[in-house]
Amino acid sequence: MTTIADKVAVVTGAASGIGRALALGLADRGARLALADVNATGLAETVDLVAATGTEVRSRHLDVSDRTEVETYAGEVRAHFGVVHQLYNNAGIAGISDTILETDWAVFERVLSVNLWGVLHGTKAFLPHLIASGDGHVINISSLNGFMAQGGLGPYCTSKFGVRGFTETLRIEMLQANQPVRVTVVHPGGVRTNIANAALAQARERGEEITEERVQRAALYNEKFLRLPPERAADIILRGVEANRGRILVGNDARLVDLAVRLLPRHYPDLSVRILRRLLRPAGTKASLPSG
């Protein structure tokens, strides 16, 4: 078992959702925190909540898609705390898309730059410090869509499958080199976060046309799928970290889908299409939104 008390933990995407819940859960367990997010307002709110518990906390506005910025941040955290034990690469975006054939390259680039490259940037920047701690742990947040593909989610699924592959490779390399760094990949199912609504808001800011069907589909997806409270998701993740698990499934939906994918690899795509079509029928079924 791993003890989190007195560990220095870095959490990206800490402004809301799972990231905020992780920050508060880590604070409850006695960690010292370095929190980052591109959303300065939400990040400040999280910092206030954490500080109210008496926890030592440092925060920074951070765009994880910017490699130089992330490398600078890693140095700042190490200089401030003197050591870094845990890294939670949680920052991510949904990125509303259509079919792969119809999705613009800019959508692929935007989603991959945050969801995949953000994880690579964070891991590469902090890994030397984690090794130096003698008791390091990398925790990368993938998704249910890191082992189950969904039509209409090409960029998102690509990014989350990539996080899974990268993390599993890193785990093997740390074991091969006998490095003091544990590596965990997390697959959340439907967590009640703001990721779907945020994707709509970001699309509006970019001037994209938002149809009523798309708005209704997002609302229905939130209602049908995004049910697990982020606080519960964070507790599952932190319990898994404490138990040194290399793979953490968050929610019954993630566990069931994982089982279906492994037992029915040839049939799960058809099952996925049928289930989503039935559940999302009232709002249209051209595309769906990510699970977590």
Positions of predicted regions on the chain:
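Canonical Rossmann dinucleotide-binding motif of NAD(H)/NADP(H)-dependent dehydrogenases/reductases
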Residues: T2-L33
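The beta1-alpha1 cofactor-binding region of Rossmann-like NAD(H)/NADP(H)-dependent oxidoreductases
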Residues: A40-T41, H61-T72, W105
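A glycine-rich helix->loop->beta "capping" turn
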Residues: T53-E56, E76-N89, I96
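Substrate-binding pocket helix/loop in short-chain dehydrogenase/reductase
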Residues: D98-I100, D104-E109
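Active-site helix of classical SDR
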Residues: T123, S159
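Residue(s) in the substrate-gating loop at a strand-loop-helix junction
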Residues: S143
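SDR active-site lid
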Residues: Q176-N252
